[in-house]
C-alpha cells in the first residue's frame, strides 16, 4: 500500500527532513490556481513559488524520491487542490497521508476536513523555533501577551545573544533606535549578487505573464533565487559582504541597492 506525503509550496525544506519517508511515500507537489489567485499576488511572488517548487521536485527526484507533480500547464490546473489530490489518492489506493503542519489556517482546515477518513501523520513544522504547544503554553502563562516580552523569552530559552546570567549581550534587548539610518551618499555598496536563471524560471515567466496578466508586476524584472544551491550561495554572499553594516541600514530603501 502506497502512502502520500503532501508538500506545499512554502514547505520546500532540506530533503533530509523527508528522508525517512522516502521509501514508502509518494511525494505530492501541486501548482494550485486558487493559491495563486485568492489575492492578486505580485507576479514575482507567483513566479518565485512555482519555479522554486519545480526546482525542489528536481532535487527530490535526484535523491530517488518518487514525486507526483501537478503543473500549471495541465488541463486540470484550475480544479481545486483537494480534487487533484484525491484523484491521486484514489488512483494509487492511498490510505495514509503524511504532511507538515500547514500555516495557512483556512487551507489547513480545508485539508484536514477532507482527510478525516484517512490515517494522517501531522508533523511538527521545522519552519519555527517553537511548536504550536509551546506557544499555547506561553499564552496560558501570561495575563497579556506582548511581542517584546515573548522576544526576550525566546532569546533566553534558546540562548541567543545572552550571557551566563541571561542578560542581553550588549546591554540592551533591542537596538531598534540604531537601525534606521539612511545610506550615506558616498558609501561603497557591495557588488550585486549574480546567479544564472534556472530553466524553470525562463519557462514560467511567459506562462505567469499570460495567465496572471491582471496581477501587478512584470516577470521580466524578476531577480530572485529559486533553488537551494543559489539561495545558500546568496546567504554566504550576505554574510560575507553585507552583514557588517546590516544593523545600521536594515530599514534603508535606496535605488542604488
Enumerate the language-model features and the residues they cover:
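N-terminal beta-strand-loop-alpha-helix module at the start
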Residues: 1-72
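Beta-rich, aromatic/charged-enriched effector core domains that present basic-aromatic interfaces
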Residues: 78-224
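Glycine- and acidic
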Residues: 37-43, 68-71, 216-224, 251-257
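Gly/Thr-rich phosphate-binding loop signature of adenosyl cofactor/nucleotide-binding cores
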Residues: 230-257
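An acidic- and aromatic-residue-enriched active-site/binding cleft used to recognize and process polar
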Residues: 10, 32, 72-74, 102-104, ...
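Short, solvent-exposed loop/edge-beta patches enriched in aromatic
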Residues: 58-66, 90-95, 227, 243
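Generic amphipathic alpha-helical segments used as scaffolds and interaction surfaces in large
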Residues: 40-44, 98, 102, 222-233
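Flexible loop/turn segments at secondary-structure boundaries
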Residues: 13-15, 35-38, 76-77, 105-107, ...
